[in-house]
Amino acid sequence: MAEENAKPRIGYIHLSGCTGDAMSLTENYDILAELLTNMVDIVYGQTLVDLWEMPEMDLALVEGSVCLQDEHSLHELKELREKAKLVCAFGSCAATGCFTRYSRGGQQAQPSHESFVPIADLIDVDLAIPGCPPSPEIIAKAVVALLNNDMEYLQPMLDLAGYTEACGCDLQTKVVNQGLCTGCGTCAMACQTRALDMTNGRPELNSDRCIKCGICYVQCPRSWWPEEQIKKELGL
């Protein structure tokens, strides 16, 4: 990914998000110490590095959806695509828009900002790590997989780069209604807002709690495993 014997250069770009993804990256140093200290160089980030001009980088982690009324964000997004070898939609706001997609404007302190979309609607995205926020463990594993060129581990994240809409309803329409649900409960355990409960071995959605992050669908093993792999794992 980078020149031989050189640390991969990583940049962090913050758009329309709550900074929760950055906190997951920087405030879990006990988990990420080896990664952040010895394995990569953080070369850009508004709150991480004292640097005004965006440099060339191997990987850009983008937090937050992009506001179509914010010219600075639109320019920054275009620039990072030109300067980064790989772009990662980091967190659900960047990957799927999360609840920011449903903004109608009028909010303080930027009432004119009313249209928010996932970054893949505007630029090519190489991989996505959803979550609100992503766990520090998955951050570390994803970056290490990139360093080791472990494409098998990264394949679901590569596939998710083109999946820009998400809702707990996806479990019903794409898993349960297709006869694929095994009742494992992984989706309910993954939901960070407790919008999902398991009832009679099937997920039941409380739409008032759902923030459209998509992590429940992503964590469901039936959402991305090919049929041949499912049969192999189950011995069928």
From Swiss-Prot:
Its cofactor is Ni(2+); iron-sulfur cluster; FAD. GO terms for molecular function: 4 iron, 4 sulfur cluster binding; coenzyme F420 hydrogenase activity; flavin adenine dinucleotide binding; nickel cation binding. Keywords: 4Fe-4S, Electron transport, Iron, Iron-sulfur, Metal-binding, Oxidoreductase, Repeat, Transport. The keyword Manganese does not apply. It comes from the Archaea. It catalyses: oxidized coenzyme F420-(gamma-L-Glu)(n) + H2 + H(+) = reduced coenzyme F420-(gamma-L-Glu)(n). [4Fe-4S] cluster 1 binds at C181, C184, C187, C220. [4Fe-4S] cluster 2 binds at C191, C210, C213, C216. The keyword 4Fe-4S applies. Residues 172-200, 201-230 form the 4Fe-4S ferredoxin-type domain. It is an enzyme of class 1 (oxidoreductase). InterPro entries: 4Fe4S_Fe-S-bd, 4Fe4S_Fe_S_CS, Coenz_F420_hydrogenase_gsu, Hydrogenase_assoc-protein, NADH_UbQ_OxRdtase-like_20kDa, NiFe_Hase_small_N_sf. Its EC number is 1.12.98.1. There are 12-13 Fe atoms per alpha/beta/gamma unit of the FRH. Reduces the physiological low-potential two-electron acceptor coenzyme F420, and the artificial one-electron acceptor methylviologen. Heterocomplex of the form (alpha(1)beta(1)gamma(1))(8). Belongs to the FrhG family. This is Coenzyme F420 hydrogenase subunit gamma.
